[in-house]
Amino acid sequence: MDSCGLIVEYNPFHNGHQYHINQARNVSNSTCIIAIMSGNFLQRGEPAIIDKFHRTKAALHGGADIVIELPYTFAVQNSDRFANGAIQTLNKFGVSSVCFGSESGSMDPFFQAYKTIKNSSEAFDNLLKDNLSDGLSFPDAATAVYETLGLTEGNLDLSKPNNILGFSYVKAIQEYAPTIKPLTIQRKNNDFHDESINGSIASATSIRKQILQSDSMDDDVHNAIPIETLHQLQSYKDKTAIWHDFEQYFPLLRYRVLTMSIKELQNIQGVVEGLEYRIQQTASDALSFVDWMHKIKTKRYTWTRIQRIFIHILTNTKKDENYVDESPSYIRILGMNKQGQQYLNYHKKNFDVPIITSIANTTHSMLAIEERATKAYYSIIPAKLQRKMFKQELQGPIII
């Protein structure tokens, strides 16, 4: 029973995601589409606009057959670590192929780029180290190396976010899961970071911006998302009275930083090179989350990198809890349909890691972090409602 894996965040699920699912099913000729989705906190260090359970429902109604969770340990990381965790998890779940969106829609440039970098690994590492020593951020340092090696020319521009992620997927497949077939489809219309909605295919960034700025869903948003996403967004807002963004966590985050010792901050995952002092010193004068970010951000420390550190502060994720280099040791199912249930029944005897449907009565260290992350995510809603929303973690997967 062939399956195709998609590495996703669905923040929120939109028409472009539905197109991706449909195209992936066609190009892979798979009977089962498996989406591995980040939980409540995302790769760029952001809270999801609605929780993972409502996003799972939207994904299942949008064509995914199974949604499994990418553990927090891998989800809130740079592109390589994010990709490594996702690919290894999908491999353990038995997928035949992985399909991702790219600028060109062709695999050849990705294979060529991987071959070039692999053959120039020593030069790549040395150039990267030199660029970082010059004070460049990791993305800028890596892009400069790509330019030096001629990898920003032609069809594959590794300065583009989707191509960077796609390349990370291909690299992870080659190194950890060579039996998986990588596939790509060409992205439609909007760029990854476009902030305005132009038509029925729009970026998740533009959809979130429109929703959060207006605190409503206007005709442009309606046109860019499936009806089930509209229902899930509205359902979450009706229950909690909010859609999540970082500004709502600002008071709690600022309080955490101001009441932590320097040593405690030093122990937070991602805090290096004295950054703990800059984070704490700027907290006192910060008037908002965005204001605080502008005070901390430097050429070396990007917005995304700082956001990831802030998420780790919210979740109290420490350096000694960094399991990112470990192989995934469980697979958690968030939801599935009948096709997904058939896939699970067909393959379950072949899995070499436990399949988890709830964090109840589990003691795994990664799941302990997941539990903290969920509690941190819901911390900005009323206490009684927090308990109710958290109970979703203890229940079985969503079945449609």
Swiss-Prot record:
Q: List the disulfide bonds.
A: none
GO MF terms here are:
ATP binding; ligase activity, forming carbon-nitrogen bonds; tRNA binding
Q: Which GO terms describe its cellular component?
A: cytoplasm
> Does this UniProt record's set of keywords contain Zinc?
no
EC numbers for this chain: 6.3.4.-
Sorted alphabetically, the keyword list is: ATP-binding, Cytoplasm, Ligase, Nucleotide-binding, RNA-binding, tRNA processing, tRNA-binding
UniProt xrefs under Pfam families: HIGH_NTase1
What InterPro entries does this protein map onto?
Rossmann-like_a/b/a_fold, tRNA(Met)_cyd_acetate_ligase
Question: What reactions does this protein catalyze?
Answer: cytidine(34) in elongator tRNA(Met) + acetate + ATP = N(4)-acetylcytidine(34) in elongator tRNA(Met) + AMP + diphosphate
Where does this protein hold ATP?
7-20, 101, 162, 187
Question: Where does this polypeptide localize?
Answer: Cytoplasm
Tell me the Gene Ontology biological-process terms attached to this UniProt entry.
Answer: tRNA modification
- Superkingdom of the source species: Bacteria
List the NCBIfam families hit by this protein, alphabetically: PRK13670.1
Q: What does this protein do?
A: Catalyzes the formation of N(4)-acetylcytidine (ac(4)C) at the wobble position of elongator tRNA(Met), using acetate and ATP as substrates. First activates an acetate ion to form acetyladenylate (Ac-AMP) and then transfers the acetyl group to tRNA to form ac(4)C34.
UniProt lists the family membership as follows:
Belongs to the TmcAL family.
State the name under which the record lists this protein. tRNA(Met) cytidine acetate ligase
State the organism named in the record: Oceanobacillus iheyensis (strain DSM 14371 / CIP 107618 / JCM 11309 / KCTC 3954 / HTE831)
Q: What taxonomic ancestry is recorded?
A: Bacteria, Bacillati, Bacillota, Bacilli, Bacillales
| Gene name tied to this protein | tmcAL
